[in-house]
Regions:
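Transmembrane alpha-helices and adjacent helix-loop boundaries
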Residues: 1-222
Length: 222
């Protein structure tokens, strides 16, 4: 049985350690991308043409360049051009924050601009300052509207963390490949069982995010 492969040696421990690396990359990236993305989204609503052009260039750059290319560029480019030597995990976190901030910022921008103008005008008529209007009216509604898309982005970041293996990070899929390669000749169904377990591990991480998103939507609607 291929299931026995999981209990040979320290295979389960290795997979769990790989999952921890995956979770570390994903959740640290999500945390900072969320904070910076909200700030970036607010900046994107600025009417200054220069600021808008810079923000648009950053967003389009992130969307046009494949994430894998950004990983390679950061991992090898920083060392060669700037003599900055970072480990693979740090590079992944920085690149994912760079990517996630742009995507989250665009979501926040869209949510902010979707607020009806009459609400803002009414707030001004009642004597609220622009800052008070933003904090008490625009921001709370925007965060509610952006939550489903933001959770979807966070789930994508978790799944995309598997690209880390391509720059030498021993995350859960890399560990799975190592186990499969070591056992392929002795166990023909090794890949099926190992990747099945990895699927389950990703599900354990991603499904609670989906449930949390539904919970927030239900609570805010009520």
């Amino acid at each position: 049985m291929g299931l026995e492969l999981l209990f040979q040696g320290s295979n389960i421990e290795r997979l769990l350690n790989g999952l921890w690396v995956t979770a570390e990359i994903a959740f640290v990236s999500v945390f900072f991308a969320c904070i910076l993305g909200v700030i970036f989204g607010v900046i994107m609503t600025n009417r200054n043409p220069i600021i808008k052009a810079i923000c648009r260039f950053y967003l389009e750059f992130v969307r046009i360049i494949p994430l894998l290319a950004l990983l390679f560029l950061a991992y090898f480019g920083l060392a060669k051009w700037f003599d900055i030597h970072l480990d693979g995990i740090s590079v992944c976190i920085l690149v994912f924050i760079f990517w996630g901030t742009a995507e989250m910022g665009d979501l926040v921008r869209g949510a902010l601009t979707s607020i009806e103008k009459h609400q803002v005008e009414s707030a001004y008529a009642l004597g609220l300052t622009p800052f008070q209007t933003f904090v008490y009216i625009s921001l709370p509604q925007s965060l509610k509207r952006v939550t489903p898309s933001a959770i979807n982005l966070f789930t994508r970041m978790v799944k995309t963390s598997s690209l880390a293996m391509l720059i030498g990070v021993v995350e859960v899929i890399k560990v799975g490949q190592q186990i499969i390669e070591h056992s392929l000749f002795s166990n023909q169904s090794a890949a099926l069982w190992i990747y099945g377990v990895i699927f389950g591990l990703y599900f354990v991480i991603c499904y609670p995010l989906s449930l949390f998103s539904r919970y927030l939507e239900t609570r805010w609607e009520s």
